[in-house]
Curated annotation (Swiss-Prot):
Enzyme class at the top of the EC tree: transferase
Bilayer topology term: Single-pass membrane protein
Record's GO cellular component terms: plasma membrane
EC identifiers of the protein: 2.4.99.12, 2.4.99.13, 2.4.99.14
Entry protein name: 3-deoxy-D-manno-octulosonic acid transferase
Organism: Chlamydia trachomatis serovar A (strain ATCC VR-571B / DSM 19440 / HAR-13)
Length: 431
């Protein structure tokens, strides 16, 4: 008991220190980009969320857009088979809240930003909502949120779980902390055997662990709609044009691609830049201007009829807009401090996939894609040649599309396995 109390106090102290270290950056985003203004009351516990109705409650949580989006087939199936349950969906980012509201409010879910995990804030929220089940998407577990839910009798599960090599080393160094952090989870449903070994390395019993594959490979029919014609018409791309979508790009990705794009003088090659963070839009624009690349902004009504390069300065459209592409690149993979983003979205839209050398956030998946030749790993030196070959060779592009479809087909049972495990837990509960 004393050890648990001490761990909680040290964890609180760490969060407070982290807040003060990040404060200048946070206030910069508030005053110059208007971020966090709509969510600060809930984040700091000033305003408590309210869930309508009666019945058992399941609380889903994911860090941001990607983690929240993968919950879609799960919530749809849950609603079909257990309609008496109420849903709560939380996320740590405003973009994630925007996405969750778009996807889940029509299912009756209550969506809000996760309050800070300080014991004096989150515990009162958990007590008010009193969830029967808490489900964490991929790995965004928060200690006080988890332990308070368990104290109140909730079941807690991790789905599509993963643990990076960096996090594994950190928790291995603090093995007791790692065990305390994840031990309250009743089940860990993981993407791969490698992640299983890492969780066991930090002290999690193998009895709690199931390996089902990556849920992101599952394509719900309603989510797999390919709107290629719709987006190409909206972007004003002709049938002769070739479109490269650069998704979730960071400034370092832009620097590398700007050099390559400057070689494309052919007006039939169009480039759509989709920033990961809209608050860095000015930085992206300056990099393109420095490289002498003329571009327009989507928000200002620009299209490919006027420009060969467009910046998509809108939220929540990337996954859909991949369908318009002839080639797709996933950003964050030329930035060693980021380590990549969702590699599967282009494949789900039947588009050839490229990614850079820094992909440690999804290293296992990246290696599988390389082995199956379902994705192209490029670096600064090879990028121009690879892109040129794909643009000029439709047969090669189609080959990568077919390999991508085959890869997804082989992996698509991951969702069904995950659902069967969760379903067995739901039906055993006495509500």
């Amino acid at each position: 008991m004393i050890r648990r109390w001490l761990t909680s106090r040290l964890y609180d102290a760490f969060l407070v220190c982290a807040f003060f270290v990040s404060a200048p950056r946070i206030f910069y985003k508030v005053f110059f980009h208007g971020k966090y203004i709509d969510s600060w009351k809930i984040r700091f516990g000033v305003q408590k969320p309210f869930v309508k109705g009666e019945g058992p409650l399941v609380w889903f949580h994911g860090a941001s857009v990607g983690e929240v989006s993968l919950l879609a087939p799960l919530l749809n199936r849950w609603r079909e088979e257990f309609p008496e349950w109420r849903f709560v969906v939380t996320t740590c980012s405003e973009a994630g809240v925007h996405t969750a509201r778009r996807l889940y409010e029509s299912l009756g879910a209550t969506v809000f930003v996760l309050p800070l995990d300080l014991s004096c804030i989150i515990k009162s929220v958990v007590r008010k909502l009193a969830p029967d089940i808490v489900i964490f998407s991929e790995g965004d577990c928060w200690l006080h949120f988890l332990t308070e839910s368990k104290r109140l009798g909730a079941k807690a599960f991790l789905i599509n779980g993963k643990l990076s090599e960096h996090s594994c080393k950190r928790f291995s160094f603090l093995k007791r902390l790692g065990r305390n952090y994840f031990a309250p989870l009743d089940l860990l449903i993981l993407q791969d055997e490698l992640y299983k070994q890492r969780f066991m390395q930090i002290g999690i019993s193998s009895d709690k662990i199931h390996v089902t594959g990556n849920m992101k490979t599952f394509i719900e029919s309603s989510l797999a709609t390919n709107r290629r014609d719709f987006w190409r018409a909206k972007l004003q791309i002709s049938s002769q044009d070739r479109l490269i979508v650069l998704g979730s790009v960071h400034p370092k990705d832009v620097e590398v691609w700007a050099e390559v794009v400057s070689h494309f003088h052919n007006s039939s090659t169009k480039i759509l830049w989709v920033p990961r963070h809209l608050e860095k839009l000015k930085e992206h624009a300056k990099l393109l201007e420095k490289a002498g690349i003329l571009f327009g902004l989507w928000s200002q009504g620009a299209s490919f009829r006027q420009y060969n390069s467009l910046i998509m300065d809108a939220m929540g459209v990337l996954k859909d807009i991949y369908s318009a592409a002839d080639i797709a690149f996933v950003g964050g993979t030329f930035d060693p401090s980021v380590g990549g983003h969702n590699l599967l979205e282009p494949l789900q839209k039947e588009v050839p996939l490229m990614f850079g050398p820094y992909i440690y956030s999804q290293s296992v998946l990246a290696e599988k894609l390389r082995e199956k030749e379902a994705g192209l790993s490029v670096n600064k030196e090879t990028l121009l040649d690879v892109v040129t070959d794909l643009l000029q060779n439709e047969k090669n592009r189609q080959a990568y599309i077919e390999k991508g479809k085959s890869f997804l087909k082989q992996e698509e049972n991951s969702f069904q396995q995950t659902w069967e495990i969760l379903k067995s837990q739901i039906t055993c509960m006495k509500i």
